[in-house]
Amino acid sequence: MLFRSPDNSKSRGQYLPMLEMAVDEEPFNARNLYYYARELFFHKDYLAAKLVFEEYLKYTKYPGEKSYALRYLAKCDPHNAEKHLKESIKTLYCREGVLALANHYYITKEWKKCFKVSLEAMQIKTRLNDFMSEEWAYGPMAYDLAAISAWQLEQWDDALRYGEMALEMSPNDERFINNVKFYRSKVDELHLRSDGG
């Protein structure tokens, strides 16, 4: 399997006009549309990226790339983010997509959904065997989101348990260290009360 790495010695600025020209020459080429939309996204031209991603979705056949494009589209079109993220998961069920949805619920403060979807993400152990596999999805994020949402739902023991799991995966993360101290103090306080202390 070949993996392409960007040439960091060259400016990204040259890619956009080249991709635009490629799309002008072959407007139905899904691969060109995908890379053009992605480059527009990197240049923070979210409206243009949204339109090109929507065009790309009409022609693509590759589920991995389509799922990834839908996650980009969710960022370009935040009012419809949940719809795009659910479609991404339906297109290709993977930890990256499920965690993106959990993170959306974290951003929108939908704590029950965030907790449920974070737990679902934890169950996905198999990594994608292509360039769509992303390291961050297999780190502490699912456990951190579960801990935060459990805290918001006043599920103190769950907050501590998942907070400790996040910390175990990233033991030097200051936020995780502080969160676990915070969660533990709440759990200890409740246990003291229940013991009549």
What positions do the PLM features span?
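Residue at a conserved register position within TPR or TPR-like alpha-solenoid repeats
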Residues: L40, L70-L73, D77, Y105, ...
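Residues that mark the junctions of alpha-helical repeat units in TPR/alpha-solenoid scaffolds
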Residues: N29, L33, K66, C94, ...
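Short coil turns that delineate tetratricopeptide repeat
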Residues: P27, K61, L92-Y93, T126, ...
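Structural register within alpha-helical repeat arrays
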Residues: Y36, Y72-L73, L101, A146, ...
